[in-house]
Amino acid sequence: VCPLQNQDTPNGELMVPHRYWPQDEHCQSLNIWTNKLDPEAKKPVLVWFHGGGYAAGSSIEQVAYDGVSIAKKGDSILVSVNHRLNILGYLDLSPFGEKYKNSANAGHADMVAALQWVHDNIALFGGDPENVTIFGQSGGGMKVTDLMQIPSADGLFQKGLVMSGVMEGDPLGAGEKDGTEIVTAMMKELGFDDVVQLETVPYPQLAAAYAKVSP
């Protein structure tokens, strides 16, 4: 699960328990539920993108995200996706050089990579790579509409279900501040003079610096 900038309050956890652990920066992963490993089955494939905007959430955060019932009772395969979020997935470092030109879209690149993996491998789990439906709720719905507009995702899914959620503004909610202003302020907060030093900072320290300088 991608590390989270903010954790839920104890009261919130009592009302709606979440599963946000274990957390790690290397969070790109898939969960797959199927009732038969038959390469000839060609079952419809459902790919779930979790809510939480672009800052929080996980593919297994709620009990309702468990795909066992669909795999047992339905005739389809369920895949759920973890990807980079918040500053790991969407901090814009592009003003600081070619190396970072796609940094503000890393989370979406993870989603496309997940769909590519599904396209290339889901037949081994009994799925049909030409019958893939992506769906999501709240922030997950936003991701579905985004993926419909990303050229590199063309052909990796055939249908999309938006279960609430629409994208407006930038993923980190930086408002009018651009990448240069925010990242420069973060480096000042951390006492750095070179953007490459951000790559050496543990996530909690990086998130704390961002929280201090973000809108």
Map each language-model feature to its residues.
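Surface-exposed, low-complexity/disordered Ser/Thr/Gly/Pro/Asn-rich loops and linkers
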Residues: 1-21
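Serine-hydrolase-like catalytic core of hydrolytic proteins
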Residues: 15-195
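Generic structural signal of hydrophobic/aromatic residues within well-ordered alpha-helices
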Residues: 11-12, 183-186, 206, 210
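Substrate-gating cap/lid region and adjacent catalytic-acid/histidine neighborhood
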Residues: 159, 167-168, 193, 197-215
